[in-house]
Design a protein with these regions (language model features):
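RNase H-like, Mg2+-dependent phosphodiesterase core
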Residues: 1-235
Length: 235
Protein backbone atom coordinates (compact mmCIF):
# COMPACT_ATOMS: atom_id res chain seq x y z
CA UNK A 1 0.00 0.00 0.00
CA UNK A 2 1.45 3.32 -1.05
CA UNK A 3 0.02 5.61 1.62
CA UNK A 4 2.80 8.18 1.22
CA UNK A 5 1.82 11.55 -0.22
CA UNK A 6 5.17 12.31 -1.80
CA UNK A 7 4.45 13.14 -5.44
CA UNK A 8 4.14 16.82 -6.39
CA UNK A 9 0.97 18.18 -7.97
CA UNK A 10 1.56 17.99 -11.72
CA UNK A 11 -0.84 17.91 -14.68
CA UNK A 12 -3.97 17.23 -12.63
CA UNK A 13 -5.64 20.00 -10.71
CA UNK A 14 -7.66 20.79 -7.62
CA UNK A 15 -10.31 23.45 -7.19
CA UNK A 16 -11.73 25.01 -4.08
CA UNK A 17 -15.37 25.71 -4.95
CA UNK A 18 -17.97 27.49 -2.78
CA UNK A 19 -20.59 25.16 -1.28
CA UNK A 20 -23.31 27.13 -3.07
CA UNK A 21 -21.95 26.25 -6.53
CA UNK A 22 -24.14 23.60 -8.20
CA UNK A 23 -22.57 20.88 -10.33
CA UNK A 24 -25.83 18.97 -10.82
CA UNK A 25 -25.78 19.30 -14.62
CA UNK A 26 -22.52 17.33 -14.86
CA UNK A 27 -21.52 13.68 -14.69
CA UNK A 28 -19.41 13.39 -11.56
CA UNK A 29 -18.10 11.16 -8.81
CA UNK A 30 -18.88 11.96 -5.18
CA UNK A 31 -16.57 10.70 -2.42
CA UNK A 32 -17.21 10.56 1.32
CA UNK A 33 -16.13 8.61 4.37
CA UNK A 34 -17.61 7.17 7.55
CA UNK A 35 -16.06 6.02 10.79
CA UNK A 36 -13.31 8.59 11.27
CA UNK A 37 -14.97 9.89 14.45
CA UNK A 38 -16.02 6.46 15.72
CA UNK A 39 -13.71 4.69 18.17
CA UNK A 40 -14.99 1.24 17.24
CA UNK A 41 -15.27 -0.14 13.74
CA UNK A 42 -13.61 0.52 10.40
CA UNK A 43 -12.90 3.59 8.34
CA UNK A 44 -14.96 3.35 5.15
CA UNK A 45 -14.64 5.51 2.04
CA UNK A 46 -17.21 5.33 -0.76
CA UNK A 47 -17.16 6.79 -4.27
CA UNK A 48 -20.38 7.04 -6.32
CA UNK A 49 -20.81 7.95 -10.00
CA UNK A 50 -23.85 10.11 -10.75
CA UNK A 51 -25.28 11.50 -14.01
CA UNK A 52 -27.96 14.21 -14.20
CA UNK A 53 -30.53 11.46 -14.90
CA UNK A 54 -29.38 9.40 -11.92
CA UNK A 55 -29.46 12.53 -9.79
CA UNK A 56 -33.19 12.85 -10.46
CA UNK A 57 -33.69 9.29 -9.20
CA UNK A 58 -31.64 10.01 -6.09
CA UNK A 59 -33.68 13.13 -5.43
CA UNK A 60 -36.91 11.13 -5.69
CA UNK A 61 -35.45 8.67 -3.17
CA UNK A 62 -34.82 11.66 -0.86
CA UNK A 63 -31.11 10.98 -0.71
CA UNK A 64 -29.28 13.51 1.45
CA UNK A 65 -26.31 13.73 3.79
CA UNK A 66 -26.20 10.56 5.91
CA UNK A 67 -25.76 12.66 9.06
CA UNK A 68 -29.33 13.87 8.54
CA UNK A 69 -30.81 10.37 8.13
CA UNK A 70 -31.49 7.65 10.70
CA UNK A 71 -29.40 4.48 10.66
CA UNK A 72 -32.47 2.46 9.70
CA UNK A 73 -33.15 4.67 6.69
CA UNK A 74 -29.49 4.54 5.66
CA UNK A 75 -29.62 0.75 5.61
CA UNK A 76 -32.80 0.90 3.51
CA UNK A 77 -31.41 3.39 0.98
CA UNK A 78 -27.97 1.83 0.51
CA UNK A 79 -29.04 -1.27 -1.50
CA UNK A 80 -31.04 0.90 -3.90
CA UNK A 81 -28.11 3.28 -4.40
CA UNK A 82 -25.78 0.32 -5.01
CA UNK A 83 -28.15 -1.01 -7.69
CA UNK A 84 -28.66 2.39 -9.28
CA UNK A 85 -25.17 3.92 -9.33
CA UNK A 86 -21.72 2.60 -10.20
CA UNK A 87 -19.71 2.78 -6.99
CA UNK A 88 -16.69 1.55 -5.07
CA UNK A 89 -15.98 1.02 -1.39
CA UNK A 90 -12.71 0.99 0.52
CA UNK A 91 -13.06 -0.39 4.05
CA UNK A 92 -10.06 -0.28 6.38
CA UNK A 93 -10.74 -2.55 9.35
CA UNK A 94 -9.51 -1.54 12.82
CA UNK A 95 -6.47 -3.82 12.81
CA UNK A 96 -5.25 -2.60 9.41
CA UNK A 97 -6.19 0.98 10.33
CA UNK A 98 -3.97 0.79 13.43
CA UNK A 99 -1.08 -0.63 11.39
CA UNK A 100 -1.34 2.19 8.83
CA UNK A 101 -1.78 4.88 11.47
CA UNK A 102 1.30 3.65 13.35
CA UNK A 103 3.32 4.18 10.16
CA UNK A 104 1.99 7.55 8.99
CA UNK A 105 0.66 9.08 12.24
CA UNK A 106 -1.65 11.41 10.33
CA UNK A 107 -5.39 10.85 9.92
CA UNK A 108 -5.72 13.25 7.00
CA UNK A 109 -3.10 11.39 4.98
CA UNK A 110 -4.82 8.10 5.74
CA UNK A 111 -8.15 9.61 4.68
CA UNK A 112 -6.55 10.93 1.50
CA UNK A 113 -5.15 7.50 0.66
CA UNK A 114 -8.63 5.96 1.12
CA UNK A 115 -10.30 8.66 -1.00
CA UNK A 116 -7.75 8.15 -3.76
CA UNK A 117 -8.18 4.37 -3.78
CA UNK A 118 -11.99 4.58 -3.87
CA UNK A 119 -11.79 7.05 -6.75
CA UNK A 120 -9.23 5.02 -8.69
CA UNK A 121 -11.28 1.83 -8.26
CA UNK A 122 -14.42 3.51 -9.59
CA UNK A 123 -12.54 4.95 -12.56
CA UNK A 124 -11.89 1.35 -13.60
CA UNK A 125 -15.67 1.07 -14.15
CA UNK A 126 -16.66 4.47 -15.56
CA UNK A 127 -15.30 7.35 -17.60
CA UNK A 128 -15.53 10.60 -15.67
CA UNK A 129 -13.49 13.80 -15.48
CA UNK A 130 -14.96 15.40 -12.35
CA UNK A 131 -14.92 14.30 -8.70
CA UNK A 132 -16.19 16.05 -5.58
CA UNK A 133 -15.01 15.47 -2.01
CA UNK A 134 -15.29 17.22 1.32
CA UNK A 135 -12.49 19.60 2.18
CA UNK A 136 -10.07 18.26 4.79
CA UNK A 137 -6.45 19.14 5.41
CA UNK A 138 -4.22 20.17 2.53
CA UNK A 139 -5.99 19.91 -0.83
CA UNK A 140 -2.90 18.23 -2.30
CA UNK A 141 -3.17 15.19 0.00
CA UNK A 142 -5.73 13.37 -2.16
CA UNK A 143 -4.12 14.51 -5.40
CA UNK A 144 -0.69 13.28 -4.34
CA UNK A 145 -2.15 9.87 -3.48
CA UNK A 146 -3.76 9.40 -6.90
CA UNK A 147 -2.33 7.07 -9.52
CA UNK A 148 -2.47 7.34 -13.32
CA UNK A 149 -6.24 7.33 -13.93
CA UNK A 150 -6.97 9.66 -11.06
CA UNK A 151 -4.39 12.15 -12.26
CA UNK A 152 -6.59 12.95 -15.26
CA UNK A 153 -9.56 14.07 -13.17
CA UNK A 154 -10.63 17.50 -11.95
CA UNK A 155 -11.06 17.16 -8.20
CA UNK A 156 -13.30 19.68 -6.46
CA UNK A 157 -12.82 19.88 -2.70
CA UNK A 158 -15.19 22.03 -0.71
CA UNK A 159 -16.78 22.38 2.69
CA UNK A 160 -20.27 20.92 3.09
CA UNK A 161 -19.73 18.78 -0.01
CA UNK A 162 -22.54 16.50 1.22
CA UNK A 163 -24.99 19.06 -0.15
CA UNK A 164 -24.14 17.58 -3.56
CA UNK A 165 -26.24 14.45 -4.21
CA UNK A 166 -23.27 12.46 -5.51
CA UNK A 167 -21.42 13.04 -2.24
CA UNK A 168 -24.60 12.46 -0.23
CA UNK A 169 -25.06 9.09 -1.95
CA UNK A 170 -21.44 8.22 -1.16
CA UNK A 171 -21.98 9.22 2.47
CA UNK A 172 -24.92 6.81 2.70
CA UNK A 173 -22.99 3.89 1.19
CA UNK A 174 -20.02 4.54 3.46
CA UNK A 175 -22.18 4.79 6.57
CA UNK A 176 -24.19 1.67 5.71
CA UNK A 177 -20.99 -0.33 5.26
CA UNK A 178 -19.64 1.05 8.53
CA UNK A 179 -22.84 0.15 10.42
CA UNK A 180 -22.90 -3.39 9.02
CA UNK A 181 -19.26 -4.01 9.86
CA UNK A 182 -19.65 -2.55 13.35
CA UNK A 183 -22.62 -4.85 13.90
CA UNK A 184 -20.56 -7.87 12.82
CA UNK A 185 -17.79 -6.92 15.25
CA UNK A 186 -20.38 -6.60 18.03
CA UNK A 187 -21.71 -10.07 17.23
CA UNK A 188 -18.21 -11.57 17.23
CA UNK A 189 -17.58 -10.19 20.72
CA UNK A 190 -21.13 -10.72 21.98
CA UNK A 191 -20.84 -7.12 23.17
CA UNK A 192 -22.56 -4.02 21.78
CA UNK A 193 -19.93 -1.67 20.37
CA UNK A 194 -21.48 1.83 20.33
CA UNK A 195 -20.88 4.47 17.68
CA UNK A 196 -18.95 7.66 18.35
CA UNK A 197 -16.56 8.30 21.24
CA UNK A 198 -18.75 8.74 24.33
CA UNK A 199 -18.70 7.45 27.94
CA UNK A 200 -20.74 4.46 26.69
CA UNK A 201 -17.95 3.74 24.20
CA UNK A 202 -15.36 3.90 26.98
CA UNK A 203 -17.39 1.44 29.06
CA UNK A 204 -17.71 -0.96 26.13
CA UNK A 205 -13.95 -0.75 25.59
CA UNK A 206 -13.32 -1.70 29.20
CA UNK A 207 -15.66 -4.67 28.81
CA UNK A 208 -13.74 -5.82 25.73
CA UNK A 209 -10.43 -5.63 27.60
CA UNK A 210 -11.87 -7.40 30.64
CA UNK A 211 -13.36 -10.25 28.60
CA UNK A 212 -10.73 -10.67 25.89
CA UNK A 213 -7.56 -8.83 26.97
CA UNK A 214 -5.81 -5.68 25.79
CA UNK A 215 -4.65 -7.13 22.47
CA UNK A 216 -8.23 -7.71 21.33
CA UNK A 217 -8.95 -4.00 21.61
CA UNK A 218 -6.72 -3.32 18.62
CA UNK A 219 -8.88 -5.53 16.40
CA UNK A 220 -12.07 -3.56 17.05
CA UNK A 221 -10.98 0.01 17.92
CA UNK A 222 -8.89 2.88 16.56
CA UNK A 223 -6.16 2.96 19.15
CA UNK A 224 -4.86 6.51 18.58
CA UNK A 225 -8.11 7.96 20.01
CA UNK A 226 -7.68 9.38 23.51
CA UNK A 227 -10.45 6.94 24.48
CA UNK A 228 -7.81 4.19 24.54
CA UNK A 229 -6.01 5.77 27.51
CA UNK A 230 -9.33 6.10 29.32
CA UNK A 231 -10.21 2.48 28.58
CA UNK A 232 -6.84 1.28 29.85
CA UNK A 233 -6.86 3.58 32.87
CA UNK A 234 -3.79 5.49 31.73
CA UNK A 235 -5.20 9.01 32.24
Amino acid sequence: LDYRAARPVAAWEFHRVPASTSLSSLNRIGIDESGKGDYFGPLVIAAVFVTPALEQDLALMQVRDSKKISDGRILELAPDIRLLCPHSLVAIGPQRYNELYAKIKNLNRLLAWGHARALENLLQQVECDLAIADQFGDERLILNALQEKGKQIRLVQRTKAESDLAVAAASILARAEFLQRLDRLSQELNTTLPKGASPAVELAGRMVVKKYGRDRLGTVAKLHFKTTKQVLGET
